Amino acid sequence: MGAESGRSDMASAEQVVRDFCAAASGGNPDAMRAFFSDDVVYHNIPMAPAEGIAATMELIDGFMGMFEKLEFEIHHLASDGPTVLTERTDHFTLNGKTAPLPVMGAFHVVDGKITAWRDYFDMGQVTAMLSGD
């Protein structure tokens, strides 16, 4: 594989993640589903991983159903081949109040599909957000 091809793969993996984050911000879980491989592993690091598209979508549907709005704000994005890292603030709106959550995300993209997604964040902030603190 030549250097040109490597740059193209990196650019496409980055674009997949950018497009995925935009779809997540749209609040439509079905739009997010289109970005996942069938064997995707989604792991919010403070919790147990969801393995496979059905388990991943069950987790996303449940989580997104708790909020009126979700927006992924990407601050920095870096990639190395199929691996894409995002430094984000995820903004969750609940009962008309928006709460920011700093997140570090790691994605693995193969053939234009996300095969792994890990998010690192402070679970205490999520608990406080859900309890209205």
Task: Outline where the language-model segments fall.
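Hydrophobic/aromatic beta-strand elements that line small-molecule binding cavities or substrate pockets
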Residues: 60, 72-77, 89-90, 102-107
